[in-house]
């Protein structure tokens, strides 16, 4: 298969974006140098409640990735409107790109059968899965999915990055240092947005 005219989509609520997101994006960008790379901020995620506005999260995500070469931060899910289903984003981009790669954490893979139109997602895009946990047994939970959809799902060999948006939010609320957790140039913004909650 020719991989010309390809796109990697890295979607998420980015609530807030952190250094783990940036490291993962950089590592995958290096693996897929031939492809465009779009970081897509979810407007209205279907599976989680987000108490920070899209406008604030998108602003932080743009700021967080502004110094990362070769990456575009997109507001397409906000422009499309409604609930931010992955399939809608993929179908928007497939009009322009021949090959779509959708980057997710391994925890998202466990519930993929519950995703809206998940079979269409796996027909239209290749899933790139990055590790979130050390426990080898977790893969047994998705064995049946991997066996039936092995042509669509690729487990990436990347280092485990132990930073989460939940931890960053909790630290901001408690007034603890965010140094090393988020890019230095957005620390004050994250503190302002999340520290007052």
From Swiss-Prot:
Annotated keywords: ATP-binding, NAD, Nucleotide-binding, Nucleotidyltransferase, Pyridine nucleotide biosynthesis, Transferase
EC number: 2.7.7.18
Pathway the protein acts in: Cofactor biosynthesis; NAD(+) biosynthesis; deamido-NAD(+) from nicotinate D-ribonucleotide: step 1/1
GO biological process: NAD biosynthetic process
Job description of the protein: Catalyzes the reversible adenylation of nicotinate mononucleotide (NaMN) to nicotinic acid adenine dinucleotide (NaAD).
Family per record: Belongs to the NadD family.
Protein's name in the database: Probable nicotinate-nucleotide adenylyltransferase
Native source organism of the sequence: Thermosipho melanesiensis (strain DSM 12029 / CIP 104789 / BI429)
Taxonomic path: Bacteria, Thermotogati, Thermotogota, Thermotogae, Thermotogales
Gene name of this polypeptide: nadD
């Amino acid at each position: 298969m020719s991989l010309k005219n390809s796109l990697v989509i890295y979607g998420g609520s980015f609530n807030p974006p952190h250094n783990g997101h940036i490291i993962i994006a950089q590592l995958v960008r290096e693996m897929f140098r031939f492809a465009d790379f779009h970081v897509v901020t979810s407007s209205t995620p279907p599976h989680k409640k987000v108490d920070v506005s899209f406008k604030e999260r998108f602003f932080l995500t743009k700021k967080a990735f502004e110094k990362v070469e070769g990456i575009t931060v997109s507001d397409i899910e906000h422009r499309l409107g409604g609930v931010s289903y992955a399939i809608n984003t993929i179908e928007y981009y497939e009009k322009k790109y021949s090959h779509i790669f959708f980057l997710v954490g391994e925890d998202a893979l466990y519930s993929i059968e519950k995703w809206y139109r998940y079979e269409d997602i796996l027909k239209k895009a290749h899933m790139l899965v990055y590790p979130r946990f050390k426990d080898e047994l977790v893969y047994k939970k998705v064995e049946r999915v991997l066996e039936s959809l092995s042509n669509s799902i690729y487990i990436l060999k990347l280092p485990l990055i132990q930073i989460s948006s939940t931890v960053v939010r909790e630290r901001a609320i408690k007034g603890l240092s965010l140094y090393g957790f988020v890019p230095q140039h957005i620390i004050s913004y994250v503190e302002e947005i999340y520290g007052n909650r």
